[in-house]
Amino acid sequence: MARKVVSRKRKAPASPGAGSDAQGPQFGWDHSLHKRKRLPPVKRSLVYYLKNREVRLQNETSYSRVLHGYAAQQLPSLLKEREFHLGTLNKVFASQWLNHRQVVCGTKCNTLFVVDVQTSQITKIPILKDREPGGVTQQGCGIHAIELNPSRTLLATGGDNPNSLAIYRLPTLDPVCVGDDGHKDWIFSIAWISDTMAVSGSRDGSMGLWEVTDDVLTKSDARHNVSRVPVYAHITHKALKDIPKEDTNPDNCKVRALAFNNKNKELGAVSLDGYFHLWKAENTLSKLLSTKLPYCRENVCLAYGSEWSVYAVGSQAHVSFLDPRQPSYNVKSVCSRERGSGIRSVSFYEHIITVGTGQGSLLFYDIRAQRFLEERLSACYGSKPRLAGENLKLTTGKGWLNHDETWRNYFSDIDFFPNAVYTHCYDSSGTKLFVAGGPLPSGLHGNYAGLWS
């Protein structure tokens, strides 16, 4: 059979009315319509590569922040408590995570110890003494503050004399030095303003600026190399400033809490006479402003939220948010709904502010939504019914209480004492919350510590 030959040439369309055999001019393929799309040339510039990497990292960072924010929002309702047994120690006032499994704590009975949250093992750390330890006569005050420097290489806390500042090296907790010639009363609060400079706030109404110089660190290393007995230096303050006392009760001008804004190099301070003070804190301390707090009773805790540029101040029943750039009448406050027991500790994590109360409660305030987190309705059989809109509240466990003479004489008819949350801190992952404290009445002897995870 003969093979039919098909022409590859395209015939021109017949004009209207033309015969079927009419032939128009022949046209080839329109190559302009059928050219293959060319890929853009690969850019091999280092600048182009770095720019792409920057954009990618920005996207990853943004995603990570969203993820952390979501976790912070959901975590509180999932936390479960595991208590630690601290023996006969009295009231844990301060705590900080050293690493993923160790927390260092300070107590009213002037004990510094490390708890391993995995094994529950307690290790006591020797406290540092003044040049003249015989001068220490004060009892019942203890260690109120523990702070790590930004690089987490030094730890600052109180000494054997509660008026003195003690510095330890991390991670070994070897002693470095003691600042023992500044304050005339107990140190209530400490804030690092750089890797080598710390500020202490005292009950005598003064703020001390201390510097751990390279010379002090070098001599400390040399002493440890030649002696197995802990040997440490004694340093003097670089500056000592009194908080303003005008128009206030001078007997109540006690520096109770400090918080540092690293971006602006500003140090916030709260005094027990109901004032917030702001200082420029670099190589010295310079006062910027003082403002009366809207709720001025029992102002004992302070935290700074760098992302929100606000200070959170705890009082008897409220948390107040201060932005130093705004007028004082713009201060926003929220009520804890636990009147009388006081806000004892406060902290920022992402957009959630954790509040510890004197009644042993942990509350969680969402600064974006401007409301406390609420309970989730539980459908579990046998669970306690909860009202919709009720604040989410975690309550500390029983802890330990000494049934001593004070308890027998004044409190024996009371079945249960809640443990005030004097201190709490999140680990670096934000998934573990260490909480500690003890009974609120000053005469009672007891303790509480727990890990919420």
UniProtKB/Swiss-Prot annotation:
GO MF, one example: ubiquitin-like ligase-substrate adaptor activity
Basic residues bias: start-end ranges: 1-12
Keyword entries, A-Z: Cytoplasm, Cytoskeleton, Nucleus, Phosphoprotein, Repeat, Ubl conjugation pathway, WD repeat
Phosphoserine: residues carrying this PTM: S15
WD repeat start-end pairs: 81-122, 123-175, 176-242, 243-286, 287-331, 332-366
Chain residue ranges for the region called Disordered: 1-34
GO biological process: protein ubiquitination; regulation of autophagy; T cell activation; ubiquitin-dependent protein catabolic process via the C-end degron rule pathway
Region (Required for nuclear location and interaction with MOV10): 1-38
Tissue expression summary: Highly expressed in lung cancer tissues and some cancer cell lines. Restricted expression in normal testis.
Subunit structure: Component of the DCX(DCAF12) E3 ubiquitin ligase complex, at least composed of CUL4 (CUL4A or CUL4B), DDB1, DCAF12 and RBX1.
Family as reported in the entry's similarity comment: Belongs to the WD repeat DCAF12 family.
Function of the molecule: Substrate-recognition component of a DCX (DDB1-CUL4-X-box) E3 ubiquitin-protein ligase complex of the DesCEND (destruction via C-end degrons) pathway, which recognizes a C-degron located at the extreme C terminus of target proteins, leading to their ubiquitination and degradation. The C-degron recognized by the DesCEND pathway is usually a motif of less than ten residues and can be present in full-length proteins, truncated proteins or proteolytically cleaved forms.
Protein name: DDB1- and CUL4-associated factor 12
Species this chain originates from: Homo sapiens (Human)
Gene that encodes it: DCAF12
